[in-house]
Amino acid sequence: TPAVPALAIVDRPITYDDARIARTIAYRQQHQDPAASGVEIEPKMIVLHHTGGGSADATWRYFDRPTIEASRKTIADAGDLNVSSQFLVDRDGTILRLMPETHMARHCVGLNHVAIGVENVGDPKAFPLTDEQVEADAALVRYLKAKYPRITHLIGHHEYLAMEGHPYFVERDPKYRTRKADPGPAFMAKVRAKVADLGLEGAPAAR
């Protein structure tokens, strides 16, 4: 097993209190496993995202609330657990860890129970993702693969629907699917090029 590489990570935990724990367990019972009783996951894949905005602080504040806002109807109808991710990468490449890596975050339909989520601050038009974020994501993927050798896949959020049919994908609600475009094929290609030696798989359609 390779040594876990040193990586500068800033711990900035969001609220993961009894309210979030209860909502996380309820979400798992509804969507993944009726017998679920905890928030722990066994990481088997990494999902990269972008936030859709330009501020790490704004994203952190949004994720910090345990309960989803009712106006996000499609998501809220599928459970009141707020969205979040284990990591948030700022535009300068600073890596923020928002919760323990093996606690479940709600970031990707069907895969939350096996996936570590990495949100990148930005969006395609106003705040295009940066070279520093490419480097940071690649370093973080390398760190996570060394720490959790069972990780086999690296995908972009826009690729997650192609995982349906794979054993990792579990979603008990056949109608709960969301279309995503983040972070996009160009960003994924850049990150994948930097970690190609790890041999991580993509979603079936992205190989």
Task: State the predicted function of each range.
Residues 104, 117-129:
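Substrate-binding clefts and substrate-entry loops adjacent to catalytic sites
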Residues 41, 80, 111, 126-134:
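Solvent-exposed, acidic/flexible segments
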Residues 1-23, 124-207:
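Basic/polar, cationic surfaces and motifs that engage anionic cell-wall
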Residues 109-117:
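Short coil-to-beta-strand
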Residues 48, 118, 157:
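Conserved, mostly hydrophobic/aromatic
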Residues 1-108:
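N-terminal catalytic cores of peptidoglycan-degrading enzymes
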Residues 87, 118, 137:
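Hydrophobic/aromatic pocket-lining and membrane-interface residues
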